[in-house]
Amino acid sequence: MRNKKKFNEFMNKTIEELKDEKRYGTAHVYQSTLNAFCEFCGCKIVYFHQLNRATLKEFETHLRDKQLSWNTVSTYMRTLRGAYNKAVDQKITTGNSRLFNHVYTGVKNDVKRALEVEEINKLLNEVPLKRLPEDLVRCRVWANLMFQLRGMPFVDLAFLHKSDLKGNTLSYRRHKTGGQMIVDIPPTAMELIRQYQN
């Protein structure tokens, strides 16, 4: 007998729980996965019995046909697997331990994401600042500072205080993790900080 319990309802409940826990990034991944799977199935209601090996393999092929990267495919599959395993643990559906064995759930590092030094220099220095609108000047200064301050995330740059600056050293706490960071400031970055510190 087929399981008439709705997978999409379980996913939506999980998404709300994640939001309640302020895990918005994970909630977004779950929502994106659910949207992609419902779009693939061609319906808004998805039942647990539709999560089978053949459907998952077809979903994987569908995602690749849409030019999604293997890492995105893997994220969707791992999210489906996580939700499925949670439903099994809660006795909402019966489990098949090999259900996701034939779809890709790994991580590929084959795409170069870093820029070469020449490319960074071109982005940050090619057009003189005086030829740019005010908002683009500010954006380029921030990008330049983030690069020179060891790849500082924008959120950390935005939350810096003047008291974090002591001489040529920045001492601050990471916004995301709370970890203490100490960064020596190169002279070119120091010049930008002095110029735009307000």
Task: List the predicted regions and their residue ranges.
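Basic/aromatic-enriched alpha-helical hairpins
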Residues: M1-K66
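Conserved hydrophobic/aromatic pocket- or pore-lining residues that grip, position, or stack substrates
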Residues: L56, L80, L123, L157
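Conserved tyrosine-mediated DNA breakage-rejoining catalytic core shared by Y-recombinases
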Residues: N101, F159-Q195
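A short, glycine-centered helix-capping/turn motif at helix boundaries
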Residues: L145-D156
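Conserved catalytic core of the tyrosine transesterase superfamily
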Residues: D65, A114, L129-N144
